[in-house]
Amino acid sequence: MEEDIWTYQDCKVFEGPGSTQEPFTYVFRVERGGNEAFRYTISADAASVKAHWPDVDPARLNDVDAMWGALSGLGFGRVRAKIDTGDLSSRTLKLMGATELEE
């Protein structure tokens, strides 16, 4: 999966895989006015991906794009909510088994 670029309100969002090996990371980089405003990173190991999406197995080559799509979907609404509230702090969402921890 390559980087995707979209706009929301006055922000430009660049999203895509950060690390393609465990722990997998998916990164949203948000710019406002041409400057980086914040990053939102999702980090997960294979077991956590399977716990959240039982039909997706990162070890299967055919499922890798599905994994990136699932991580993108998980972060999309959270990034928009951060923009809506004006929260420009960088955060990392860690998937640990079926639980989530945002730091």
Give the ranges of each region predicted by the language model:
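Short, charged/polar N-terminal "headpieces" of proteins
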Residues: M1-A37
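Acidic, low-complexity intrinsically disordered segments
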Residues: S48-E103
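Amphipathic alpha-helical packing elements
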Residues: E22-A66
